[in-house]
């Protein structure tokens, strides 16, 4: 079992590493490519676009051909794209490389969640996804620090060579450690069960909405945090970094505590707790009389996301044993596109950073609480499939 957990964690971590590792080198990248930092900030959106594009096909291929045939090309593409970015001499080529990086990371991301659905029952999967969420929270803190240390002695290109080496490690794991977990193709008698795993299932759609809104909350916070903390609240850059590190610490602590909480409380209770924390955060930020109270509200955001997201993802994947890849892709596309659409629309309409965050917190909590309380799971399918090792 440990091989599947290690491989799944490695496959997922390419996604945040690809986002956070290069940011510290952005000024030098812009200078070398004769582009402004503002022009290169679009690299974040381009990377997410690549991920979304990969998710359009990766899940279906993973369900038809297996997890390894998607993970291996995905990791290989991430390696090639990282090298391509390091060799880019224009901003256009650099952005093309970032799109390809997103494609590779997206393939790996989809496969990771499908593997966990294949190999773990509902309760264990919820615990593992909570742990995975905690580990993912480490990357935004450690990746920029690692990038800074690398750039003390090496040029910015070394950041992408480091990403390439990470991709090589994931490729080796996918080739030699990961075993195929895709359930055997259903016999004719099993076709009704395959057809019953509809993406239009009310319970699945409710969890798509909940997880998409939750991701929108956390990405809105990350996207607006420089404005909130430095421009509005007046913190210095060093203080901003310290606060973000502390929020990551809160996220990790809650994420690593959630598996123990699942041994005591029902998953539904933790999901309700998550949304109540979001609602409390929104109200706190809306009426905050001081910076200290606002910072407390921010910690509630991190705690709320960490306590509920892994549980919601596990519930979303639960109804799918034969179409776990497609379900994982659908979740990923909805989360990436939904959160990006909200941030873009809020910016176009002219909603300020503070109100943008408060608005999504309150909307997420109200909608999600209604869905949790009124959309019950249907008849469960097999909790997990026996792993068939394919020749």
From Swiss-Prot:
Q: Does the keyword Cell inner membrane apply?
A: yes
The UniProt entry lists membrane topology as:
Multi-pass membrane protein
> According to its record, what are the GO cellular component terms?
plasma membrane
Subcellular location(s) of the protein: Cell inner membrane
Q: What are the transmembrane regions? A: 4-24, 42-62, 69-89, 93-113, 131-151, 158-178, 203-222, 245-265, 269-289, 293-313, 331-351, 356-376
Entries under Gene3D superfamilies matching the protein:
Multidrug resistance protein D
Q: PROSITE patterns of this UniProt entry? A: MFS
Main location per UniProt?
A: membrane
Recorded hits in InterPro entries, A to Z, give: MFS, MFS_dom, MFS_Efflux_Transporters, MFS_trans_sf, Multidrug-R_MdtL
Q: Mind telling me which CDD domains this protein's record contains?
A: MFS_MdfA_MDR_like
- What's a Gene Ontology MF term here? transmembrane transporter activity
| Tagged with keyword Cell membrane | yes
Described by its record, this protein's role is as follows: Confers resistance to chloramphenicol.
Q: Record's family?
A: Belongs to the major facilitator superfamily. DHA1 family. MdtL (TC 2.A.1.2.22) subfamily.
How is this protein named in the record? Multidrug resistance protein MdtL
Q: Which organism is it from?
A: Escherichia coli O139:H28 (strain E24377A / ETEC)
């Amino acid at each position: 079992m440990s091989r599947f957990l290690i491989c799944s964690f490695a496959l997922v971590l390419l996604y945040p590493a690809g986002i956070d590792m290069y940011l510290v080198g952005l000024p030098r990248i812009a200078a070398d490519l004769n582009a402004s930092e503002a022009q290169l900030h679009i690299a974040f959106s381009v990377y997410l676009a690549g991920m979304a594009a990969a998710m359009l096909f990766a899940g279906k291929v993973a369900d038809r051909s297996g997890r390894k045939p998607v993970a291996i090309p995905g990791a290989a593409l991430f390696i090639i794209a990282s090298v391509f970015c390091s060799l880019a001499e224009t901003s256009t080529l650099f952005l093309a490389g970032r799109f390809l990086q997103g494609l590779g990371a997206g393939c790996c991301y989809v496969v990771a969640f499908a593997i966990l659905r294949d190999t773990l029952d509902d309760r264990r999967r919820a615990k593992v996804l909570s742990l995975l969420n905690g580990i993912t929270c480490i990357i935004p803190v450690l990746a920029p620090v690692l990038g800074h240390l690398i750039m003390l002695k090496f040029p910015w290109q070394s950041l992408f060579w480091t990403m390439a080496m990470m991709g090589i490690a994931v490729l080796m794991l996918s080739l030699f450690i990961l075993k195929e977990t895709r359930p055997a193709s259903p016999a004719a008698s099993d076709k009704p069960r395959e057809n019953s795993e509809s993406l239009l299932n009310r319970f699945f759609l409710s969890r798509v909405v909940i997880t998409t809104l939750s991701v929108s909350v956390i990405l809105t916070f990350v996207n607006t945090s420089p404005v909130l903390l430095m421009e509005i609240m007046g913190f210095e850059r060093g203080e901003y970094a310290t606060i973000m590190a502390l929020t990551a610490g809160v996220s990790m602590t809650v994420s690593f505590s959630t598996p123990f909480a699942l041994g005591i409380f029902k998953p539904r209770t933790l999901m309700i707790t998550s949304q109540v924390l979001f609602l409390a955060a929104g109200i706190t930020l809306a009426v905050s009389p001081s910076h200290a109270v606002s910072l407390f509200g921010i910690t509630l955001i991190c705690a709320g996301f960490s306590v509920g997201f892994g549980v919601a993802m596990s519930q979303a994947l639960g109804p799918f044993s034969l179409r776990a890849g497609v379900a994982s892709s659908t979740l990923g596309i909805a989360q990436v596109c939904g959160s990006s659409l909200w941030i873009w629309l809020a910016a176009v309409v002219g909603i300020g950073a503070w109100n943008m965050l408060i608005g999504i917190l309150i909307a997420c909590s109200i909608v999600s609480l209604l869905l949790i309380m009124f959309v019950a799971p249907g008849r469960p399918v097999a909790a997990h499939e026996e792993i068939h090792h394919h020749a």
